Amino acid sequence: MAVAVGRPSNEELRNLSLSGHVGFDSLPDQLVNKSTSQGFCFNILCVGETGIGKSTLMDTLFNTKFESDPATHNEPGVRLKARSYELQESNVRLKLTIVDTVGFGDQINKDDSYKPIVEYIDAQFEAYLQEELKIKRSLFNYHDTRIHACLYFIAPTGHSLKSLDLVTMKKLDSKVNIIPIIAKADTIAKNELHKFKSKIMSELVSNGVQIYQFPTDEETVAEINATMSVHLPFAVVGSTEEVKIGNKMAKARQYPWGVVQVENENHCDFVKLREMLIRVNMEDLREQTHTRHYELYRRCKLEEMGFKDTDPDSKPFSLQETYEAKRNEFLGELQKKEEEMRQMFVMRVKEKEAELKEAEKELHEKFDLLKRTHQEEKKKVEDKKKELEEEVSNFQKKKAAAQLLQSQAQQSGAQQTKKDKDKKNPWLCTE
């Protein structure tokens, strides 16, 4: 029988019986129909070394062939490549995004290999937060790119986790749902595989790495999740090749020594991974991403912006009060900055004026020095000119005197010559 719940002013709840059918028992159907028409999105981050089988496992999980480019081991750094696909099963549409970590683990110095991954996850959170903070939000049409599940591919060494794996998972565990898996599990003997799993889980616990916990609080999935949790990390094998086994064709990897069936639970944990990731807990992964990881990021960002739920006295703070407080704080800082800039401008102007005055003084001094030098040089030139003029005048006088003496000498010589002639020819005179 349907039951109505009211909330009186005294906050006590009373159960009321309905006298007839109302219709809100169809709410689950309405929600299912609405969700089905909208479709779903699911974003998977694959973290692992180059060539460890990330693309093959994705193809096997979703029973299709996704686009993938062959990667080399020569990447200078880690970069993330995201590809989105539209899938449909029955009448349910799924927008699937697969993000690959290209070049992860290929560098000699692996200290910062996790940073591009963390930055990518934060960038998706930031994009969603910016959409939420818009005045006109459109979350209905927004393509949510937040990472819902991180499949962390562990190399099948059979010994222990690499330091790179521990550091990366520790940096990611507060930002994403980590599901550790052992890749290419068919390369490890079965007895060694159990020891390897135990060693991995022990190292994760001792290093404080928080991996995704399958929910056990819902009766419908509690039993299967509790059973599957003991198999972590899942040891998987991926293959899209069909091999004939008896009278049937099955996905498997064929070796000279035998066949490893992908969907045979005695051979690997692929079926367990698919059940846990897709069939049972896909919605919980989406919910955990929003309510846990995104909320943590959102809270930290809003606190950085100065938004808090309580004031220093632990009293509730309204959004309006927070806004006014931040606005006043911002205006105060703005006025302070303006005053600092004004003072700095005045100081710079004074410094410039002093520099200009000093430069002007130096120019005047240089001008006076040049003027004095010019006058001195002019005086020297004039004195030299006067000396030269006197020398020319004296030279002219001497020249005139010399010419006069020469002329007189010539005249005297001519007269003497005539006298001498007269003495030699006296008869000329008598005649």
From Swiss-Prot:
Disulfide bonds: none annotated. InterPro entries: G_SEPTIN_dom, P-loop_NTPase, Septin. It is found in: Cytoplasm, Cytoskeleton; Synapse; Cell projection, Dendritic spine; Cell projection, Axon. The modification N-acetylalanine is found at residue 2. One of its GO terms (biological process) is cytoskeleton-dependent cytokinesis. Residues 320-408 form a coiled coil. Residues 100-103 are annotated as: G3 motif. The modification Phosphoserine is found at residue 9. Residues 401-416 have a biased composition (Low complexity). Its main location: cytoplasm. Residues 400-431 are annotated as: Disordered. GO terms for cellular component: axon; cell division site; dendritic spine; GABA-ergic synapse; glutamatergic synapse; microtubule cytoskeleton; postsynapse; postsynaptic specialization of symmetric synapse. Keywords: Acetylation, Cell cycle, Cell division, Cell projection, Coiled coil, Cytoplasm, Cytoskeleton, GTP-binding, Nucleotide-binding, Phosphoprotein, Synapse. It comes from the Eukaryota. Pfam families: Septin (PF00735). Residues 48-55 are annotated as: G1 motif. Residues 183-186 are annotated as: G4 motif. GTP binds at residues 48-55, 103, 184-192, 238, 253. Residues 38-304 form the Septin-type G domain. Highly expressed in cerebellum, olfactory bulb, hippocampus, cerebral cortex, thalamus, and corpus striatum. In the hippocampus, strong expression around the pyramidal cells of the stratum pyramidale and in the stratum lucidum of the CA2-CA3 regions. In the olfactory bulb, particularly strong expression in the external plexiform layer. In the cerebellum, concentrates in the molecular layer, particularly in Purkinje cells, where it is found at the base of dendritic spines/protrusions, at the dendritic branching points and in some GABAergic synapses. One of its GO terms (molecular function) is GTPase activity. Belongs to the TRAFAC class TrmE-Era-EngA-EngB-Septin-like GTPase superfamily. Septin GTPase family. Filament-forming cytoskeletal GTPase. May play a role in cytokinesis (Potential). May play a role in the cytoarchitecture of neurons, including dendritic arborization and dendritic spines, and in GABAergic synaptic connectivity. Septins polymerize into heterooligomeric protein complexes that form filaments, and can associate with cellular membranes, actin filaments and microtubules. Forms homooligomers. GTPase activity is required for filament formation. Interacts with SEPTIN7. Interacts with SEPTIN9 and SEPTIN12. This is Septin-11. It comes from Rattus norvegicus (Rat). The lineage of its organism: Eukaryota, Metazoa, Chordata, Craniata, Vertebrata.
